[in-house]
Structures are given as C-alpha cells and as structure tokens.
Regions:
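Glycine/Thr-rich phosphate-binding loops of Rossmann-like dinucleotide-binding domains
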Residues: 13, 35, 88-89, 121-122, ...
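Short glycine-rich anion-binding loops that position phosphate/pyrophosphate groups of nucleotides
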Residues: 33, 83-86, 116-117, 158
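Class I SAM-dependent methyltransferase SAM-binding "motif I" and its flanking Rossmann-like core
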Residues: 97-159
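Short, active-site-adjacent cap segments at secondary-structure transitions
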Residues: 86, 118-121, 186-188
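Conserved anion/nucleotide-ligand pocket segment
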Residues: 144-149, 153-191, 197
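N-terminal beta1-alpha1 cap of cysteine-dependent amidohydrolase-like domains
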Residues: 1-77, 81
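Glycine/threonine-rich flexible loop motifs
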Residues: 85-94
Length: 200
C-alpha cells in the first residue's frame, strides 16, 4: 500500500512530485466542506496543476456512488484535503467509498491524505476530537478509522493555531502510537514501512 500523509499538502507535495506529474488525480475536498477556513484547498489545487497533474474534483458526500467509482477507478492518485475528520470518515463509511478506496489502494494506487485525510487512516479517530468537532449529524456508532496504518497521525504538531491542542493530545493519548508531524513534514508509507520526510 502506498500512502503519503501530511499536515499541509501545498507545503510538502513537491517532495513526491515524481508520483504526481502527468498523473490522474481524484481530488476530494469533502472534509473541508464544514470548515470556515479552506485556503489549503485552493493552494493544493494550484500545486497539483503546477506539478502537471490531471485533476478531477469530486465530493463524496453529494456525488452518486457510480460516479465516485468511475473517478477512483480512472485515477492514479487519490487525494483527500484537510478539514473535519469526523465528517470525512462519516461520508466515506456511509457511502461505501471506504471499501472502494481500499480496493483501489490494493491495486497499487497512491493515496495522499492531508490533515483530516491523514487522520482517517488510523484504526480509530477518537484521539482527534479535541481538534475536530464531531458534527451533530455524525451517523456512525463508533469512531473507527480506515485502519490502513497501525499508528495515529497528529498533524500540525506545535504549529499555530494548533500548538496547545496538539501538545494536549500528545499528553492525554501517550498510550497511542502517535506520529506527530508539523506542516513541513510528510509520512511516506510503502511496502518497506514508513518514514517521515521533511521539506527544508
């Protein structure tokens, strides 16, 4: 399975430019739909364009499953923007896109997860509730993540405006295998294992 997980894609995406140039990217902004600030969505769009990717944008909370399926099947890379982790995992599970994603990743496609898109890869996302408010219409009975990795990404570590909350999560969830990353770091996961890479 190939994953690139980060806090802020437009700051670190160029680290994996070989994986993106001339590739077809399914761009999923769904997590950002419930957020006030969404500047990171535009900056990610801009970077993909600059790196030569062919981008198809799709919102999994409103599109028909058949459309999502055809976009995912056609893509080389599947990218999830940041936003609200609970809203994103709810939409993935509710629509069955979670299983579709796993099927496509099993074919060797690359998933890029930014912030919420990285958080949802963990076995559970309960640890992030202090950073992400659970929506009132959250429809899942638990906080299970996609369980693609055996650790828990903590994005924006010690980075404003998340400095205090990320410190708090590190302390309160010290029993979890947390992997804190700042906005200039990314985690590369492949068959060999995982490593943190950094943008100078």
């Amino acid at each position: 399975m190939k994953l690139f997980l980060c806090s802020h894609f437009s700051s670190v995406g160029s680290l994996i430019k070989e994986e993106i140039g001339n590739k077809k990217v399914a761009f999923i902004p769904t997590a950002s739909l419930r957020e006030g600030y969404t500047g990171y969505v535009g900056s990610a769009r801009k970077l993909f364009k600059k790196l030569g990717a062919i981008v198809t944008e799709i919102d999994i909370s409103t599109e028909a499953y058949s459309t999502i399926q055809s976009v995912f099947e056609d893509a080389d890379v599947i990218y999830f923007t940041g936003g609200n982790s609970f809203f994103l995992i709810d939409q993935l599970r509710k629509t069955g896109t979670d299983e579709l994603l796993k099927k496509e990743l099993a074919k060797g496609k690359l998933m890029i997860g930014e912030s919420a898109g990285a958080i949802i890869c963990a076995p559970s996302i309960q640890y992030i509730e202090q950073m992400d408010e659970k929506p009132e219409d959250y429809s899942q009975e638990d906080d299970a993540g996609l369980d693609l990795i055996d650790f828990y990404v903590l994005p924006h570590y010690l980075t404003a405006p998340f400095k205090k909350v990320t410190e708090k999560i590190m302390t309160e969830f010290s029993d979890l295998n947390l992997c804190p990353i700042n906005n200039r770091q990314g985690i590369v996961i492949d068959g060999e294992g995982s490593k943190v890479i950094c943008k100078d």
